Amino acid sequence: MKNKSIFYIFICLLFILLSINFNIAAEEISLNGAVKLLNKSSSQLDNVLRDIESAEIDLKLAEKGLAAEVTLQTSYTRLDEAPQSPTEYVLSPTGKINFQGSEVNKYRFIPVTFKKLSQDNYRASLSINKPLYLGGQVKNAVKLSEKAVQLSKLNYEKTLNERINSIIQAYFNVLIKDSLLSVQKNSLKLVQEHLDNVIKNYEAGMAIKSDVNEVEIELNKSKQSLYQSENELKIAKKRLADLLNLPDLDFSLIEPKLPELKEELNFHLQRAYNNSFELQSLLLKQKMNDINKEMENKLFKPSFFLNGNYTVQGDKLDLDQGDFNITLSGSVTLYDGNKSKLNLKKINLEEASLKNNQKQLRSNIETEIMAALYKIDENKKKLKIAEKNKIHALENYNQAVKSFNNGVANSLDVLRAETNLNQIKISQSQTYYQYMMSVYNLLYQTGTLNNYFEEVIKSENK
């Protein structure tokens, strides 16, 4: 009895473990979930975030451009022999000289007794250097650093938009390959059923051997297509798993919702202009050029510094017996070898290039938005046609099977109808997902993918 109880417990535990494994294998990932995983696992996004942090540190450094600098220097010297200082002198005549019309004697002091001084010598110096005014260069350096922070944050948004688009492409590629596999499985099932019917007719003398061979050939072709579809699905899942840093391929995808869409060109153009990372980047660079111009124009303005120094020196380190001095200094650049003018010329050339790039970029954006809208319209029309074709192909297939069963049609008619139905199902499935992809591509081209997944990204960053 005890052994039976242990056996039942073992069976229950095994069932639980298998259930857990099944649940893990059957894990479903939504498009929102994929974006969450991307935000968590993307090393490229991590690198861009580090760039933002680095730019913010540069901004803090620029803000400290007028900060005081305090320097402390100390030294100690031990002499090999103690120095001597004279304490008594004698006067010794050295001759006569004419002084103011009279002849007078000259003398010199000759030391005769000495005292030893300390062999120790201490020295300490405290210096404070404070820039008071640097010709407005610090203020402009802060402005440049602020623009650099904005540029790095803009680069993060651009990178995030591109990475989300990569995820969407890989995500829908898996859905397409999965749907193709389902079509191939269903096709194989239909061919197998037809083969069974042909074999029965052959055994009953109602079909010839070549009919059986034709269907078996078609069955083998269906198996080959099935193996190819299975392999393509594995590759597509592996690419998505690599993007999301998933450990294995034991997952399935949930079909995402279709974003709401306005098919107005001007509406999407305005969104693209407002959200274009490249356009915003060019505008920031133009502002940075303006700041650089201002810095070059202020190069010949004076700079002022305040310097304070307190020094103590002696055989004892007595901080109360030091010397203090304070200095106010100024400097101005009178001539820089014409470098400033050359730099201004270079900045003006860069500004002209930025304006040309901006004009070309706006033209490119318009082309991409028009192409995206045309693709949506094309896929929508193709999808309607594909759905009608599927209905007709299914009717033809059912009619061919019915005619074959009634002895009116031959086996090849059924195979042709089945092949046509299979191709139309594949086309309809691909067109359906391509239509969804084209809608998401419009979000990508308008730079609004980040906004569409904003809540998902925010929830992950909390």
Which residues does each PLM region occupy?
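Periplasmic alpha-helical coiled-coil/stalk elements that build and connect Gram-negative outer-membrane
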Residues: 1-8, 29-33, 57, 158-271, ...
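Bacterial N-terminal signal peptides
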Residues: 10-20
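Sec/Tat signal peptide C-region and signal peptidase I cleavage site
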Residues: 20-26
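Acidic, low-complexity, intrinsically disordered peripheral segments
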Residues: 32, 78-84, 89, 427-462
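Amphipathic alpha-helical coiled-coil scaffold segments and their short linker/junction regions
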Residues: 35-41, 91-111, 246-306, 451-462
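Small/polar (Gly/Ser/Thr/Ala-rich) solvent-exposed segments
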Residues: 46, 69-84, 113-119, 129-158, ...
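Amphipathic alpha-helical coiled-coil segments
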Residues: 47-62, 159, 163-182, 193, ...
